[in-house]
Structures are given as structure tokens and as C-alpha cells.
UniProtKB/Swiss-Prot annotation:
Gene name as annotated: NP
InterPro entries, A to Z: Flu_NP
Molecular function in Gene Ontology: RNA binding; structural molecule activity
Protein name: Nucleoprotein
Maturation and modification: Late in virus-infected cells, may be cleaved from a 56-kDa protein to a 53-kDa protein by a cellular caspase. This cleavage might be a marker for the onset of apoptosis in infected cells or have a specific function in virus host interaction.
Annotated Pfam families: Flu_NP
Family as reported in the entry's similarity comment: Belongs to the influenza viruses nucleoprotein family.
Keyword Disulfide bond recorded: no
Motif (Unconventional nuclear localization signal): 1-18
Keyword entries, A-Z: Capsid protein, Helical capsid protein, Host nucleus, Host-virus interaction, Ribonucleoprotein, RNA-binding, Viral nucleoprotein, Viral penetration into host nucleus, Virion, Virus entry into host cell
Organism annotation: Influenza A virus (strain A/Shanghai/11/1987 H3N2)
Signal sequence, renumbered to the chain: none
Length: 498
């Protein structure tokens, strides 16, 4: 594991980051959660939502989106400079669902962005509370990761749909800051860099002039973030090469795709945080729980305990399975879209199925969907055990799947062997070891050749009973190896469309 001396913990990324002790970090994260909760309570009052309606996850998503849009300065500026028909750049809104006369009705609400900003700041002691906004962005990103497979985006950038386990955070907005960068997968960073290089190839002014200097420094910063996620010297050296290139072009794209493929076996460190919807924090705050005083962590038992005691509802379409909808949201809450399903089933205490076997579409309801046939049901978000989130790739001291996903990106720090289909991964590495990065490529391939899927990662780490808050008695799970480990297994999940 890379020396962590230079890295800040997530919580420091979540906070404004001077070194803090554990208690201060917990209080500071708790304060952020309090702010989201207070904001949500206030919005439910503004919208005149009943308790049940306020706990509806679709209403939560609309409210979260409204505040994110109200604070999206770049887009707000763009909308004011490029007025489009029928869009008021000063307003934000979305669908709010209410129970009227025994059925669900959709109501489109519209608010001044200024008003939403005022309510948000008031809930956050007058601050802009950017951390709380980022927290909601990560929750939306985790929900997208669980709902959609990014096949099309992968293919467009010349990558392979089987690399979907590297795509965590691929829908996070640019403005998500350090906390956002921490949760982005290797493939996400590679894709952002490839898009940038392609623009440079097609537009000769991209790297030039005053703007080009900013572009260049953004490029180098992204390369450094990606380099920091790799755990082997050869992969990092390769990133130095890409970063230092005078004129990034196809050679760099090749190197980036190579390094992304290598991450299927030599996994990068990607942070995982349990970010819950605002409709979980709101009721907890209104019941008198003081997150700042009690302290809160996104990577320990706290989110599990909170979900054990929360009641969240969802709209259900006529042919959807409420249990499947629950699994989708449960996985999103724990940022577990790319974790091994055998492990998730163990932690959750009920079988977790691959995406393609779930009879459920996304959580959001499109504006043209018929509300007459909508029912609602309780989401089952409780778990049997809890486990500590990891930000390492879980590589063994050195370092079986399908046509769909062929590797995992661990979420929980729990002992298991990390399944990957070695022959499938290695088949992608035939031939091309020439060029300036040939020695690094050879070294990376050598390490991958030596990796054994049956080797155990996170040795000795286990899950914990929910009563074991201090994590004193790890329970090391045993797995049925015959079971499929990948969520996007040869899959038919819908595509994510911006």
C-alpha cells in the first residue's frame, strides 16, 4: 500500500482539511449531515409534504437536484448567457409526488434559485456548505453506478465494456472537488483524460494561449490524481509519461487504455463512502438526533445504524419488484455497485442478484410516465452485518468472471479472494509492448501474469455484528465460490443518458 503520509483521509477531504483528530472529523462530518437534514426538513415544509411524502425517495432526489442546480454557478452563468426557450435561468424545480385521494399525483414545482440558496445556507449556519452539496453529488453518482452500465461511454472512448468495474463516479460533475476525485474509479479518470486528449487532437487551439495554460494544468492535475490511485511503481511511471507528454495524442490514449486494463488485476485505490439520500437525514434530525454532537463517519458503522432505523419509500411501476428496487438502492447507499455479490449477500443477509436479473428500472420516474398505475412500497435498506469501507484495491502482496464485468472494485474491507477472469484480461494484452513505455508495459504484464485469483485479499478482515460498534470481533465470511461475483454479469442494464 502506498505510504499514506501524503494522502489526506476522506474525512479530511470532506472537511476543509487541516489535520484533525478522529473526534473532530466525526463532529465535522456530523455537522455536514445535520445541514442536509435541516435543509430537507425545511423543503418538506415549503412543499407541504406529509411525513410519508417526505420519505419518498423520488421527492428526495428532486429536492437534492434543485439545490445542486441552484449552486451550479458555471451552468447558471451559461444559462444566463445562452438563454434557451422555455428555460428560466433563475429558477429550478422538478417533479414532486403527492398522495391525493388514494393515488399518486405528480406536481411540477418551480422555485427561485436564490430562494433555494437562502434555505440551504440558513440550514447550514449561513455557509455555502459545499461539502454537503458534494455529499449529495456522490449519492447521485453511486445511484447511477448501481442503476446503469456505462457501455456506450466506454466504447466511445475506445475502452471495453468489460471494464465497467473501473467506472465508479463516471457521472460525477466536474465541480465535485477532492471528495469527488477520491471516489472516482481508474476508468473514470482515464475516460476524462481521453476526452481531453481527443479534443486537443481535433482542436489545435485547445492547448494554446491563456486558456490552453489552464487546460494544461487541469490535464496534469488529472494525471496526478490518477497516478495517486495506482499502487505499483510501473503503473505510476506510466502516468508520469502521460503527464509529461509535450503534445498529448494517440500514444497517450494507448497508454491510458493499457493502464486502465491493467487495473482490472492490479487494482487502484478508490474511496468508498456511504452517502444516503436527504430523506434519511431529515427525519433523523427532526426526531432530535444531533449528528454533530454524536459524531458521524461515512466509512464505519454509522450509515448502517442509520439505515436500520430509517423508513424510506419508493414509487413502484406496475411490473417492478419492490425487493429488487430495495437492492438497487441499498447497493447505492453503500457505494457497492462494483463489489463482489457473494460478499454483499453475506453483509446484507439476503441474496444480492446481478443487475440483469433485477425486475426494476431506475429510481427516477420520467415526466411522460403514467402516474395512474404507480404504487409505492417500503425500501428494505437494513443489513445483517456491517463492514468497514475500503479505499484500497485489495491487491494481494503481489498482485473467474464473464462476458460482462470481469473484475471487481472492493467496497468493504473484508477477507475474500477477488474474482477476475485472468485469461480474459490477459487476452487484451497481446503484442503491443513497443514504444517509450515498453519497459513499464512489460513490467506491468509480468505482475499481472503473476497474480492469482485464488489469493486472499484483506486477510483477517471481517464483517461485524450491528451490536459490535467498536469493531472488536471480526467475522470472516466463507463464500460459495461457485456463485457469480459480478453485478453487471453479461448484462442488460439500461444505459445512462445525460
Amino acid at each position: 500500500m502506498a505510504s499514506q503520509g501524503t494522502k489526506r483521509s476522506y474525512e479530511q477531504m470532506e472537511t476543509d482539511g487541516e489535520r484533525q483528530n478522529a473526534t473532530e472529523i466525526r463532529a465535522s462530518v456530523g455537522k455536514m449531515i445535520d445541514g442536509i437534514g435541516r435543509f430537507y426538513i425545511q423543503m418538506c415544509t415549503e412543499l407541504k409534504l406529509s411525513d410519508y411524502e417526505g420519505r419518498l425517495i423520488q421527492n428526495s432526489l428532486t429536492v437534492e437536484r434543485m439545490v445542486l442546480s441552484a449552486f451550479d454557478e458555471r451552468r447558471n452563468r451559461y444559462l444566463e448567457e445562452h438563454p434557451s426557450a422555455g428555460k428560466d435561468p433563475k429558477k429550478t424545480g422538478g417533479p414532486i409526488y403527492k398522495r391525493v385521494g388514494g393515488r399518486w399525483m405528480r406536481e411540477l414545482v418551480l422555485y427561485d434559485k436564490e430562494e433555494i440558496r437562502r434555505i440551504w445556507r440558513q440550514a447550514n449556519n449561513g455557509d455555502d456548505a459545499t461539502r454537503g452539496l458534494t455529499h449529495m453529488m456522490i449519492w447521485h453518482s453511486n445511484l447511477n453506478d448501481t442503476t446503469y452500465q456505462r457501455t456506450r461511454a466506454l466504447v466511445r472512448t475506445g475502452m471495453d465494456p468489460r471494464m465497467c468495474s473501473l467506472m465508479q463516479g463516471s457521472t460525477l460533475p466536474r465541480r465535485s472537488g477532492a471528495a469527488g476525485a477520491a471516489v472516482k474509479g481508474i476508468g473514470t479518470m482515464v475516460m476524462e483524460l481521453i476526452r481531453m486528449i481527443k479534443r486537443g487532437i481535433n482542436d489545435r487551439n485547445f492547448w494554446r494561449g491563456e486558456n490552453g495554460r489552464k487546460t494544461r494544468s487541469a490535464y496534469e492535475r488529472m494525471c496526478n490524481i490518477l497516478k495517486g490511485k495506482f499502487q505499483t511503481a510501473a503503473q505510476r511511471a506510466m502516468m508520469d509519461q502521460v503527464r509529461e507528454s509535450r503534445n498529448p495524442g494517440n500514444a497517450e490514449i494507448e497508454d491510458l487504455i493499457f493502464s486502465a486494463r491493467s487495473a482490472l488485476i492490479l487494482r487502484g485505490s478508490v474511496a468508498h463512502k456511504s452517502c444516503l439520500p436527504a430523506c434519511v437525514y431529515g427525519p433523523a434530525v427532526s426526531s432530535g438526533y444531533d449528528f454533530e454532537k454524536e459524531g458521524y463517519s461515512l466509512v464505519g458503522i454509522d450509515p448502517f445504524k442509520l439505515l436500520q432505523n430509517s423508513q424510506v419509500y419508493s414509487l413502484i411501476r406496475p411490473n417492478e419488484n419492490p425487493a429488487h428496487k430495495s437492492q438497487l438502492v441499498w447497493m447505492a447507499c453503500h457505494s457497492a455497485a462494483f463489489e463482489d455479490l457473494r460478499l454483499l449477500s453475506f453483509i446484507r443477509g439476503t441474496k444480492v442478484s446481478p443487475r440483469g436479473k433485477l425486475s426494476t428500472r431506475g429510481v427516477q420516474i420520467a415526466s411522460n410516465e403514467n402516474m395512474d398505475t404507480m404504487e409505492s412500497s417500503t425500501l428494505e435498506l437494513r443489513s445483517r452485518y456491517w463492514a468497514i469501507r475500503t479505499r484500497s484495491g485489495g491487491n494481494t502482496n503481489q498482485q473467474r468472471a464473464s462476458a460482462g464485468q470481469i473484475s471487481v472494485q472492493p467496497t468493504f474491507s473484508v477477507q475474500r479472494n477477488l474474482p477476475f477472469e485472468k485469461s480474459t484480461v490477459m487476452a487484451a494484452f497481446t503484442g503491443n509492448t513497443e514504444g517509450r513505455t515498453s519497459d513499464m508495459r512489460a513490467e506491468i504484464i509480468r505482475m499481472m501474469e503473476g497474480a492469482k485469483p485464488e489469493e486472499v485479499s484483506f486477510r483477517g478482515r471481517g464483517v461485524f455484528e450491528l451490536s459490535d460498534e467498536k469493531a472488536t470481533n471480526p467475522i470472516v465470511p466463507s463464500f460459495d465460490m461457485s456463485n457469480e461475483g459480478s453485478y453487471f454479469f453479461g448484462d442488460n442494464a439500461e444505459e445512462y443518458d445525460n
